[in-house]
Each structure stands twice: as C-alpha cells, then as structure tokens.
C-alpha cells in the first residue's frame, strides 16, 4: 500500500505515479513550492439495502495542497439532515445515511479536488421496500441484541476495506490519464503513450517508441532521466513543437533543418549503449563544431539568443565545448544526412499539433472532441451549412477536426452517435508562432483592409477613450430603442382607435352582415388561409365573437354564428397573422373514412388527404370535427384548439396540416401515424418468460430512444406554454423508424375507456396518470405533465401494463393521496426508475423540468444500453420499490375488484391548454 500522510506536518509524496494527477508547481495555493498532485486511493462500492437500514460510504484520496470533498446524489449536492451525515477529514470523507427510504436510491458520487486536478468515484445505491410485517418482526428479534450506533462511533471504519475490487487493483497499474499533466498541457494521443505499460524507474534504459524522434532513435534505448512518464512525454511534446517551428521558418535552410532535428533528438534524449548498459553516448564533438562553425552558424547563434543551447531542460542543442572527444560517440552529421529530408511546410496550411487564430487552416489528425467522443466523418454530414458540397476541402478530411469557413472559434466536428456540434481537444499555438499562417481575408476584397485599419485604430486609442466610446455607443443605442418603442406605441394606439370606429360602422349594416355571399367573397379575397385564424387579433378570445341574442336571426346553416361573424369583418389594416395562419384544404382533397373515436367535444375520423403541399402522394390523416348536435360553445372550443396547435412545429408533436369546410362544418386535419399508438406497440413487444439478457439490453436501448423523443416533444410544448394534461403511451403515435409523435386522441378512443374516470363535478380524467395536486385541486402545469411522464416511463418499461392495475379508480385516488408509488418494473434500469421517482416528487418544485429530463436521457443514451441494468433475482411479490409507506396492493389480487368499464360520451374537454398560469377548475366544476 502506498504511504499516506499522517496527522503531523510531514507530507509524504508517493514514490510512484500510479493513478496520479500532477499539476504545476506554480499553481495557486501551492505556497510550499512542492509540485501539487492528487490520487484517489479507494473506489465506492455499489450497495443494495432494505428500507429502514443504514448505509456508509467512505471516499479516500491523497494529495497536496489540502483536498476538498463534495458528495453528489444524481448530480445534485447531498443535503445534510438528521438522517444524512457527512464528516470530512484530511484525506477522507464519510457519508452515512440512516433510516433508508426507497427515495434514497440513486447514484452517489464523491468528488475530490485540489489545485492539481479533480477525481471522482461513483456508487449505485438501491433501497428495496420491506413490508411493515417484516420490519416489525425484524425489530422484535433484534431489540435485545443490537443498539443504535452513533455517528461518532464509526472510527473503526478507518480500517475497513477501501472498496477496491481485486481486478481494479491489478488493471492498468501504469496507465496515466490524459489530464494528468494539468490543464495547461496538450494531451498526448493514446498511440503516442509509448511508456504506458512499462514499469517506470529513473535511470533505466528503455527502447524508444515515441513519435518526435522516430526517424533517428528508432530501435535505440534512451535513459529515463525525469521523475515521471509525463515529464518524458514533455520531451517529445517540446521537440515536436520546436521542430515544427524550425521547419516552418523560411530563413532556415533545408540542410540545417535536418541537422538541427538530429542534434536535438540526441541531446534531449540521453541515448544508452544498450538496455543492459546504462552508459550514455553523447554527440561527437567534431560534428558539433562543424555544425556550429561551418554548416549552421547563424541558426545556432539565433538559438543561443533564445536560451536553446546548453544543458537546461529546454535546451535543444548542446554546448560543443562541454562534449568529450571520445571515439565512442554519435556521428549526427552522417545520421542526419542519410535520413530522408524534412518536407517543406505548405505555407497555406497549419501543422498538426496546434491551430492558429480560429483554426481555419488547421489540417491535423485529431478526431476526438473535448468531452472524449469520437468524431463522425464529414462525408456523412447532412447539415445544410457544413457539408462536402459546400466545403470541398472536407472531402479528404475523413473525421478529423476542422473549422470550415471559420464559422466557429476553433476546430470542431460532429460527435458520434448523436451528431452534435462539439469543439475538439486541439491546443492553440502560441501567439508569436507561425505569423504567416494568421487568418487573412479573401484576396481582392477591400473589406479586410478596412476592418484591419479599424482594429489598428481602436488598439491605438487610450483605454479611457475606449471606455468613453463604448459608453456613448450604448447610450445612443438605448436612446434609439426608446424612440422606436414610443413610435410603435403611438401607432398601435391610433390603429386600435381606427379599428373600433370601423367596427362600430360595420355593425350598423345588417344587410352586409347577414349576406352569405359577402362572407364567401371576403374569404376568396383574403386567400386560402382560414379567416378564423388570420382575421381575428391574437389577444381576442373566440367566445367574445359570439353575436348578441337580439341580432341573431334564423341561421342559414347549422354551423355556429360567431364563426360566420368572424368572417364578415375583414380588417382594413394589415394584421400580422403569421402565427395563426392555417392552410385551407378543399373538400375535393379530403376523403373522410371510418370513425376512430368520439368524445364530448368532438369526433375523430380517419381520412386520406391528396394533392397537398405536404405530400405529393395520398397520406393518412386524422380528421377532428364537432358532433352534429354541438353547441356554439363546443364549436368555439374546437376553434380554440385549432388556435392552440396551429403554431406547433416539432418532429415529435402531431402537426396540424390544415382545416377544411365540408358540409357546413369545420374540420381540423392532423397527420396520423398508420402504425398506431405506442401502447399497442408495447403490448405486441411483451417478451416471453424465457427471454435472454441480450433481448433485455436491446429493449432498454429502444425504450430509451422512445423516451427521449417523448421528452423532446414535451419540452417543446412546455416552451410554448402549453400543458398536455393527458400524457400517456396511448397518446403517443408511432411512425416509421420508431418516430414518436405526441397527440391527444386517446380520450376519444373507446378501447381506452378503463383509463378514464368520471370525477364528481368534472370531466372524464386519467387519474392513474395524474399527480396529487391535479386530482385534488384541479391544478395542471408543467409539473403535473412531468408526473404523467414518469407514469409513461413506467408504462414503457412494463410493456404497456396499466398503472395500479387491479385497483379501482377510487382506490387509485386514495393510493396517490397516500404517496403509494408504482413499483419498479422488472429489468428496469436503476437510473430510469430513479428518474420516475423524481417525477413523482410530492413537492412540485423538486420535480425536474422537461429540459432537464431530455438532457439526462440524451446523456444516458450515449452510454452503454446495459450500463445501468441491475438484475432483480429477489422475490418481488409483496414488495414495492417506489413507495414511501406501506406497499401498494399487489397486482391481480382478488381483494381488489377490477373497475367497471364505462363508455364515455360526455364530460371531456380539449386536453392541451395554454399555460399562462397554473390551470385550476372552477367551483362549479366547469373545466374552463
């Protein structure tokens, strides 16, 4: 075991560098001058406990300066309570949780940091629920044999096992991480870590397998002269940078480039005679004198001015006077001239180790992002802005990092597998290196010269003058903005006054109002956009357009009068109606087929839409319309729903194709997925009893893909301030390639009658998917949709089972009120069920948002699909992993009669509402 710092002032730095992260001696907080380092000495173990038990985690590390410990649960800080205690010491930290609850399940991470680096270790805690009867028997049996152990009595925990598995102890003993050298060093590629896997000891001779001096030191042995592998990698790194600078300098001859590289390699690396003989062979003194005096005198003089000659660690060339005249030496003259000449550097391109300015001319071979993901080939890019057709130079760039067109601040690429734009882990060249490779404007353009002149003029100004100019510009911009706002307000005021005057004038002309011909004329005049969307200002409610009773005569058609009146008042002023413009479909383009379902506020039919802009061939659609006996309020409700969904444009939300006037009725035409809904797909995919682990892994990967799409769609709806109120698998339609689209047709389908319950003074409600505040108070918000999303996840991983199956709807209401949560589905990953429990948090402020859920699901999809699968071999009968109290009645018990199915023909209302405030039911029970 490695030495550990004791309690006195003596700090012992480990003798080896196994798993060490080093920093720079000049880092902040290193007052002793000692090189900062950090190493994690133990790993957290996964734990499975029962509710009521306690768990103890210990995190240990070594390092200097002093270490800082942070505990996280599911990426959030662990809060200290009466049950949760944290004690930090100099080199360890302990987390103790007593009286465990199923809500304590999750990922626990210990992060240790100091100025050198930051390391971490993670454990998965799973807490299983234990029935009350079992708890009582355990408590009685152990009352006289055990006692509660105080937190201060855990001192013997210091000597416990450090949590390291045997295979973890022996694996990768000598592997150094990419970040071991600190943030100021450019990481070395994995293929260039030629010392990894070798027992490192100062003074040993090791065969050189590096990159910088491969041309001269191949198959030769070099002495390990530095304290760690990383410092030996620094030699290769510095040599590569220096040689690239020399090769790019136009004043250095081709011969001197070859000679300087050979001399630098044999000087910075101490060459041994053999692996068994540790005697160093130096450069021949005669060759050194010839190079210094005859071949490259000016180049060596320039190097001496920059302190590159001598025996310092940065010196590339030796002092010839200090070399011995022995015959056992290295003839660098013949070695350099016999090797292949150094290729001329293309002045228009950059070398592979760093980039200049924004990296427009970078042509290196780095193919990894800063987050460690592999880059996707440019030829596979489907982006309209960055592809091989727009930038032909990307054709031969494979999957290397580039900055085509200089649109980004540094080289980047599309990362696998999601195709996200990410910056690459490429260092930037020093500011004074490669001045001829600075980004230039296109030749023949005068804009580049003007911008450079302005930049030079700005740099020449005094800082006080620069601040004054910036302040004046900001003040002038604010003044212009204020004047513009005043002008807009005045124009809007005049416009509203003129509109009121025109409306008053139009109301005195009943012959025009009651003319159906004029109504059709104005529709034709205004184009194909539906007048109800484009001719009513957005802030006017549709119910306000209902005419007064004294002006209503016998309607010429059975359609609602306020819809006709909205058509008869074409605005004399142009109105910005882009947000509500809906495509109008002619009756000849739409064929209405069989009825799919029926609710209080409408009927849904399947249909075929032809000759449309959205599809050159016939496409399946869903047609929603009012019932033939619908009231004006119900027709206005359909109108309001069209307003709501008209602006929706997202690949995971059902899209309104247009509206159609057929048989004097208004029809809303939606896209429809011919593969049915997600619930039907899940029931078909129920696995057999003897399914293997491979099938579970494949199913989990597909489920995660489906859940991510639902989260994306709900995130979009939340950003549009809309609340769905009925999110479930029955309302998720399945398209080609498993594309999921969120809809709200489930309420209208009789096959899902058992999913809804007619509540007192309310409509039919999906109580099995509703949160406590939605059931008891009628409060709907994004938080209540998040609760429904958690139940939808439960549906997915249980292959379409009904939540709380076996219990009646009234019993479900009581279970939700008493915090009886759904149990963890069989073979459900721990992180997925942990997310479900977070969605069901009693405090709505503690539930995650859809943006957080989407981000978390996307990050999990990048990991191995089987990453979080925990086998559930224990007997699950009678247990309830998601409850904070007594277990919910197990499914399919005879003591709980199944709910009688009711066919709903009334009481429903549109499910998606604008979320201007938390939606609440009124006292009279009306849902609007």
Curated annotation (Swiss-Prot):
Region annotation (Disordered) ranges: 1-34, 873-928
Compositionally skewed regions (Acidic residues) per UniProt: 1-17
Expression (tissue specificity): Expressed in AIM neurons and in several head neurons. Isoform a is expressed in some head muscles and in several head neurons. Isoform b is expressed in several head neurons, in procorpus and isthmus pharyngeal muscles, body wall muscles, and to a lower extent in intestine, seam cells (V cells) and distal tip cells.
Main location: membrane
Biological-process GO terms, alphabetical: axon guidance; cell migration; cell surface receptor protein tyrosine kinase signaling pathway; establishment of neuroblast polarity; interneuron migration; motor neuron migration; neuroblast migration; neuron migration
InterPro entries in the record: Frizzled_dom, Frizzled_dom_sf, Ig-like_dom, Ig-like_dom_sf, Ig-like_fold, Ig_I-set, Ig_sub, Ig_sub2
Disulfide bonds: 59-110, 205-272, 213-265, 256-296, 284-329, 288-320, 354-429, 375-413, 401-424
EC number(s) stated in the UniProt entry for this protein: 2.7.10.1
Domain Ig-like C2-type residue range list: 36-126
Domain Kringle: 353-429
Family: Belongs to the protein kinase superfamily. Tyr protein kinase family. ROR subfamily.
Protein name: Tyrosine-protein kinase receptor cam-1
């Amino acid at each position: 075991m490695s030495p550990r710092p004791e309690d006195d002032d003596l700090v012992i730095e480990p003798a080896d560098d196994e798993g060490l992260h080093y920093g720079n001696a000049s880092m902040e907080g290193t007052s002793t001058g000692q090189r900062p380092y950090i190493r994690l000495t133990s790993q957290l173990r996964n734990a499975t406990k029962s509710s009521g038990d306690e768990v103890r985690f210990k995190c240990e590390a070594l390092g200097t300066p002093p270490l800082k410990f942070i505990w996280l649960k599911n990426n959030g800080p662990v809060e200290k309570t009466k049950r949760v205690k944290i004690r930090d010491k100099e080199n360890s930290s302990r987390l103790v949780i007593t009286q465990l609850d199923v809500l304590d399940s999750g990922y626990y991470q210990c992060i240790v940091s100091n100025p050198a680096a930051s390391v971490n270790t993670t454990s998965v805690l799973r807490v299983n629920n234990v029935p009350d009867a079992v708890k009582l028997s355990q408590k009685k049996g152990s009352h006289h044999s055990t006692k509660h152990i105080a937190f201060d009595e855990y001192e013997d925990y210091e000597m416990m096992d450090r949590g390291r598995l045997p295979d973890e102890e022996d694996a990768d003993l000598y592997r150094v991480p990419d970040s071991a050298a600190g943030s100021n060093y450019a990481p070395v590629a994995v293929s260039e870590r030629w010392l990894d896997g070798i027992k490192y000891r100062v003074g040993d001779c090791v065969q050189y397998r590096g990159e910088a001096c491969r041309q001269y030191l191949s198959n030769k042995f070099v002495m390990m002269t530095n304290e760690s592998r990383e410092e030996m990698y620094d030699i290769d790194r510095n040599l590569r940078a220096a040689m690239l600078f020399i090769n790019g300098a136009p004043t250095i001859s081709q011969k001197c480039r070859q000679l300087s590289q050979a001399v630098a390699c044999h000087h910075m690396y101490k060459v041994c005679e053999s692996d068994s003989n540790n005697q160093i062979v130096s450069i021949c003194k005669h060759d050194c004198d010839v190079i210094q005096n005859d071949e490259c005198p000016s180049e060596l003089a320039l190097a001496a001015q920059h302190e590159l000659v001598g025996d310092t660690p940065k010196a590339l060339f030796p002092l010839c006077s200090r070399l011995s005249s022995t015959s056992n030496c290295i003839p660098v003259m013949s070695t350099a001239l016999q090797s292949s000449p150094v290729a001329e550097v293309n002045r228009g391109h950059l070398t592979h180790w760093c980039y200049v300015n924004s990296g427009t001319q970078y042509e290196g071979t780095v193919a990894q992002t800063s987050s460690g993901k592999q880059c996707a080939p440019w030829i596979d890019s489907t982006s309209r802005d960055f592809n091989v057709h727009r930038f032909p130079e990307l054709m031969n760039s494979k999957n290397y990092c580039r900055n085509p067109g200089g649109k980004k601040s540094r080289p980047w690429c599309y990362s696998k597998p999601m195709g996200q734009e990410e910056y690459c882990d490429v260092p930037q060249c020093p500011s004074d290196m490669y001045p001829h490779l600075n980004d230039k404007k296109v030749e023949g353009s005068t804009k580049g010269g003007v911008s450079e002149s302005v930049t030079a003029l700005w740099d020449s100004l005094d800082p006080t003058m620069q601040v004054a100019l910036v302040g004046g510009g900001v003040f002038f911009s604010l003044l212009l903005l204020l004047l513009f706002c005043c002008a807009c307000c005045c124009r809007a005021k005049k416009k509203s006054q003129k509109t009121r005057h025109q409306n008053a004038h139009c109301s005195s002309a009943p012959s025009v109002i009651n003319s159906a011909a004029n109504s059709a004329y104005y529709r034709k005049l205004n184009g194909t956009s539906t007048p109800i969307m484009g001719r009513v200002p957005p802030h006017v409610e549709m119910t306000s357009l209902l005419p007064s009773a004294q002006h209503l005569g016998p309607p010429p058609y059975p359609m609602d009068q306020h819809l006709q009146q909205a058509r008869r008042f074409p605005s004399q002023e142009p109105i910005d109606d882009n947000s509500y413009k809906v495509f109008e479909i002619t009756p000849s383009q739409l064929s209405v087929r069989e009825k799919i379902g029926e609710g209080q506020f409408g009927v849904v039919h399947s249909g075929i839409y032809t000759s449309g802009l959205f599809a050159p061939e016939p496409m399946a659609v869903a047609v929603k319309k009012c019932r033939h006996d619908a009231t004006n309020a119900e027709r206005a409700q359909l109108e309001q729903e069209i307003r709501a969904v008209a602006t929706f444009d997202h690949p995971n939300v059902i899209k309104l194709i247009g509206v159609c006037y057929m048989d004097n009725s208004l029809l809303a035409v939606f896209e429809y997925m011919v593969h049915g809904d997600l619930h039907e797909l899940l029931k078909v995919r129920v696995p057999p009893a003897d399914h293997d682990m491979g099938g579970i892994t494949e199913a989990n990967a597909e489920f995660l893909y489906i859940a991510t799409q639902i989260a994306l769609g709900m995130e979009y709806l939340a950003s549009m301030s809309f609340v769905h109120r009925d999110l479930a698998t029955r309302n998720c339609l399945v398209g080609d390639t498993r594309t999921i689209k969120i809809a709200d047709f489930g309420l209208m389908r009789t096959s899902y009658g058992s999913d809804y319950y007619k509540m007192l003074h309310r409509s039919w409600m999906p109580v099995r998917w509703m949160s406590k505040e939605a059931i008891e108070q009628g409060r709907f918000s994004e938080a209540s949709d998040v609760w429904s999303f958690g139940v939808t996840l439960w549906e997915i991983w249980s292959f379409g089972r009904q939540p709380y199956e076996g219990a009646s709807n009234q019993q479900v209401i009581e279970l939700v009120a008493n915090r009886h949560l759904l149990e963890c589905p069989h073979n459900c990953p721990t992180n997925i069920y942990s997310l479900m429990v977070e969605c069901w948090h009693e405090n709505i402020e503690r539930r995650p948002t859809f943006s957080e859920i989407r981000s978390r699901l996307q990050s999990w999809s990048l990991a191995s699909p089987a990453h979080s699968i925990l086998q559930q071999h224990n007997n699950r009968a009678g247990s309830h992993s998601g409850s904070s109290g007594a277990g919910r009645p197990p499914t399919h018990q005879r003591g709980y009669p199944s709910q009688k199915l009711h066919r709903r023909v009334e009481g429903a209302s549109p499910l998606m509402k604008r979320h201007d405030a938390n939606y609440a039911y009124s006292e009279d029970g009306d849902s609007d």
